[in-house]
A protein has these predicted regions:
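Conserved N-terminal entry element of GNAT/NAT acetyltransferase domains
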Residues: 1-15
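Conserved active-site tyrosine of GNAT-family acetyltransferases
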Residues: 23, 114, 119
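Conserved beta-hairpin
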Residues: 41-54
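Conserved beta-strand in the GNAT
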Residues: 51-59, 64-71
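Short glycine/proline-centered loop/turn elements that form peptide/ligand docking sites
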Residues: 82, 86, 107-110, 127-133
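Conserved GNAT acetyl-CoA-binding A-motif
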Residues: 93-107
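Conserved catalytic-core motifs of GNAT/GCN5-like acyltransferases
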Residues: 102-104, 120-137
Length: 140
C-alpha cells in the first residue's frame, strides 16, 4: 500500500530496565547473526575504605573499545588515578582483543586529559547549547 501512514501507539516506559533488557538482547542477537558482533562489557573500579572512588566502563565490540563514564572522585583528581584507570581499561581491552579505542567527552569534561593519553579528535559538534561534544579515538 502506498499513501498510508502507519501510526502505532508507542508506550513510554519508565523505569525501563526490563523492557530495555528484552529489546537490547534481540538487537544483540541481530548484530551477532549479521556480523559476528558480540559486546563484552566490564567496569574497572577503585575502592578506598569500601567506597568506590574511581571507575570507568568498557564496551568491546567489533575489535574496538568504547570507553564510557570514566570518573574519579574530586579529591583524587590530578593524582594520576585517572591515568591509571584509563590505562587499566585499555589494557583489559587489549587483553580481550581490541586494537582501537573510542570515546566522547564534552567541553566541560576531560578533553585535554584524553589528548594527553593519545586520543585524537575525529568529530566535534555543538551540543548542548553553549558547549560541544568531542568524539575521539586512538590505536591500542
Amino acid at each position: 500500500m502506498t499513501g498510508h501512514t502507519i501510526r502505532p501507539e508507542f508506550q513510554c516506559v519508565e523505569p525501563d530496565d526490563a523492557e530495555y533488557a528484552d529489546y537490547a538482547a534481540r538487537f544483540g542477537t541481530y548484530n551477532s547473526d549479521a556480523g559476528g558482533w558480540q559486546v563484552q562489557t566490564f567496569s574497572m573500579i577503585l575502592r578506598r575504605d569500601g567506597a568506590i572512588v574511581a571507575g570507568g566502563r568498557g564496551h568491546i565490540y567489533l575489535g574496538a573499545l568504547e570507553v564510557r563514564g570514566l570518573w574519579v572522585d574530586a579529591p583524587l583528581r590530578g593524582t594520576g588515578i585517572g591515568a591509571a584507570l584509563l590505562g587499566a581499561i585499555e589494557d583489559e581491552a587489549r587483553r580481550r582483543g581490541a586494537s582501537k579505542a573510542m570515546l566522547y567527552t564534552y567541553s566541560w569534561q576531560a578533553e585535554p586529559f584524553y589528548r594527553r593519553h593519545g586520543y585524537r579528535e575525529y568529530a566535534r559538534f555543538d551540543f548542548p547549547a553553549g558547549h560541544y561534544r568531542i568524539d575521539m579515538d586512538k590505536d591500542l
